[in-house]
C-alpha cells in the first residue's frame, strides 16, 4: 500500500445508497458481499489485497487490481484493463438519506472510441460501474438485483419482473420526461413505427435510432444506424410486468458491452422508478470526460 494519489478524474459517479457508511464499507470489502452485487469472484484482505474478477468484470479472466490506499472511508486501487493501468477509487461520506458513494476512475478511452466500438474492455467501465452501484443500492435495500453484464457471452438478453402494470412500464419507456427520470439521460422519442429515438436528444443525434416495431403496452424494437437492434417485450401477470430486453445484429466477436451494460443499468433505474416511487433517483452526479453537454439529466 502506498500513499494516496489524487482522485481519478476521467469518470466520476456519485450516488446515495440506503445504509450508513460503516455498512456500505462492509459491502465494499466483504468478499461474500462483493460476489453478490459486483463480481463472480472476489478476494479481499485489506490493506494488502482488493481483487475481483470473472465473467461479470471487464477483462476479468484474472484479477488485475492492486491496492494503493485504504482508510475507513476510502479504497483506492490500480486496475489494469486491456494492458492499461487505470486508477479507481471508492470514497464514502455521510448523507441524510444514507451514504454518498463516489466512484472515480482514470485512464479511460475517449467517448468517441467508445461510440465507435474501438475502446476494448476499458470502454465498458463507465456502464459497468453504473450498473454495479445500482446493484449495490438494491443489495443494501434487500431488493432483488438487476442482471449483470456477462462479458464472456455474445447473447445480450435479460429479463426482469417489475411491480407495475405493462401499460405503465411501457409508457415510462417511451415518454421522454419519464424516461429521463429513471435512465438519467435526456432523450427525444417519437413513439410510433418509423419514429426516432435519440439518446441525448435530436440535437446531439439527429438521425437517432428508429422504431421498426411498436405495439403500445407490449413491444417495441429499435434499429440503430449500424443495423443493430434493441427490443423490449412486456408481459403482464397479477399486476406485474415481465420485461425482456434483447440486443442483436452485432458482430459476435465484438459484442457491444458498453451499451448493453448501460441498458441494464437503466433497467435497474426503471425498476426503482416504479417500485419505489416516493424515492428520488440514487444518482447525484455523472461526469464522463468527453461526453457532450446535455447528455445526462441528473437531479442534483
In which residue ranges do the predicted regions lie?
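Hydrophobic pocket/interface hotspot
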Residues: 24, 34, 67, 77, ...
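Short amphipathic alpha-helical signal-transduction/dimerization elements
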Residues: 130-141, 267-278
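Hydrophobic ligand-binding cavity/cleft-lining segments
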Residues: 1-43, 131, 135-188, 300
Amino acid at each position: 500500500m502506498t500513499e494516496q494519489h489524487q482522485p481519478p478524474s476521467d469518470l466520476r459517479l456519485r450516488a446515495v445508497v440506503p445504509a450508513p457508511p460503516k455498512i456500505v464499507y462492509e459491502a465494499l470489502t466483504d468478499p461474500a458481499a462483493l460476489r453478490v452485487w459486483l463480481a463472480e469472484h472476489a478476494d479481499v484482505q485489506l490493506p494488502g489485497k482488493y481483487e475481483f474478477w470473472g465473467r461479470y468484470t471487464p477483462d476479468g479472466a484474472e484479477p488485475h487490481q492492486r491496492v494503493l490506499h485504504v482508510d475507513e472511508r476510502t479504497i483506492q486501487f490500480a486496475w489494469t484493463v486491456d494492458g492499461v493501468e487505470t486508477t479507481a477509487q471508492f470514497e464514502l461520506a455521510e448523507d441524510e438519506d444514507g451514504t454518498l458513494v463516489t466512484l472515480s476512475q482514470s485512464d479511460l478511452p475517449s467517448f468517441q472510441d467508445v461510440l465507435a466500438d474501438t475502446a476494448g474492455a476499458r470502454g465498458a467501465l463507465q456502464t459497468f460501474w453504473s450498473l454495479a452501484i445500482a446493484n449495490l443500492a438494491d443489495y443494501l435495500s434487500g431488493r432483488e438485483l438487476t442482471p449483470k453484464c456477462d462479458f464472456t457471452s455474445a447473447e445480450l438478453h435479460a429479463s426482469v419482473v417489475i411491480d407495475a402494470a405493462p401499460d405503465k412500464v411501457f409508457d415510462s419507456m417511451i415518454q421522454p420526461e419519464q424516461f429521463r427520470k429513471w435512465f438519467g439521460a435526456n432523450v427525444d422519442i417519437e413513439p410510433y413505427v418509423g419514429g426516432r429515438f435519440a439518446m441525448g436528444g435530436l440535437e446531439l443525434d439527429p438521425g437517432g435510432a428508429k422504431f421498426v416495431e411498436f405495439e403500445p403496452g407490449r413491444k417495441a424494437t429499435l434499429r440503430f444506424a449500424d443495423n443493430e437492434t434493441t427490443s423490449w417485450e412486456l408481459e403482464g401477470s397479477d399486476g406485474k410486468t415481465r420485461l425482456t430486453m434483447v440486443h442483436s445484429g452485432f458482430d459476435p466477436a465484438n459484442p457491444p458491452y458498453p451499451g448493453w451494460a448501460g441498458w441494464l443499468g437503466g433497467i435497474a433505474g426503471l425498476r426503482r422508478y416504479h417500485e419505489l416511487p416516493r424515492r428520488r433517483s440514487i444518482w447525484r452526479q455523472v461526469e464522463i470526460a468527453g461526453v457532450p453537454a446535455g447528455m445526462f439529466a441528473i437531479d442534483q
